[in-house]
């Protein structure tokens, strides 16, 4: 409740309803973080998954989001290194079996937005994901997960992510869309199948 003095004395202003996210989760710090896909090429579903103690947090992402994230992580880490030249280099070497997604694969939501940040005092990268909502939904209510991980963990995620993406259907060099074995309709070629 808010009360304020007006010309006629005390005026009551009802509280404003402030939209809140459905939930916010901090995985801080991640014991392990990875991305992977389940399914056959052309029908795969992509995930980011992290563990902390006994907790497993999984979200669904798009293939293009994983590819962009992998590129963005490398660019982001290059900036962090440039601004902090005394930091040891983050390794990107990974073991495939360790990077595979693990059950339970029970995603909390489909990701709409992805962001990166860096806490210099803790030398941790935060991977921020926000729930994808429909246009009718209040965007302020989107659920949020923040994955706090070491630079090495995030670099391994990025390099493994590139590998996961590359195992799918080849990408058309003209339009950037996935190609099917029987070809695809390329907008750059006026829709002709090639």
Label the model's feature ranges.
Residues 21, 33-34, 123, 169, ...:
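Surface-exposed peri-terminal alpha-helical interaction modules
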Residues 18-40, 87-144:
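Intrinsic, low-complexity N-terminal interaction/targeting segments
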Residues 17-71, 75, 79:
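The feature marks the first
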Residues 56-60, 68, 72-96, 109, ...:
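N-terminal pre-domain and mature-chain start segments
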Residues 1-19:
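N-terminal amphipathic/basic-hydrophobic helices that include classical n-h-c signal peptides
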Residues 44-49, 69, 73, 125-129, ...:
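Short, structured motif recognition centered on aromatic/hydrophobic residues
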Residues 183-190:
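Short cysteine/histidine-rich zinc-coordinating motifs and their immediately flanking basic loops
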Residues 59-61, 129-183:
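Mixed-charge, glycine-accented linear interaction segment located at domain edges/termini
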């Amino acid at each position: 409740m808010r009360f304020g003095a007006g010309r006629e004395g005390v005026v009551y202003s009802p509280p404003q309803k402030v939209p809140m996210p459905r939930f916010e989760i901090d995985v801080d710090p991640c014991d392990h973080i990875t991305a992977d896909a389940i399914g056959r090429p052309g029908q795969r579903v992509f995930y980011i998954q992290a563990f902390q103690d006994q907790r497993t947090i999984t979200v669904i992402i798009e293939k293009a989001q994983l590819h962009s994230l992998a590129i963005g992580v490398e660019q982001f880490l290059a900036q962090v290194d440039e601004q902090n030249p005394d930091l040891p280099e983050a390794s990107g070497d990974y073991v495939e079996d360790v990077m595979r997604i693990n059950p339970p694969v029970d995603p909390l939501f489909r990701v709409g937005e992805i962001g990166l940040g860096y806490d210099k005092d803790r030398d941790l990268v935060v991977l921020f994901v926000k729930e994808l909502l429909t246009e009718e939904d209040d965007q302020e209510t989107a659920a949020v997960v923040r994955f706090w991980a070491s630079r090495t963990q995030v670099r391994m995620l990025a390099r493994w992510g590139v590998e996961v993406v590359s195992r799918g259907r080849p990408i058309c060099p003209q339009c950037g869309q996935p190609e099917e074995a029987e070809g695809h309709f390329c907008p750059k070629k006026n829709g002709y199948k090639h």
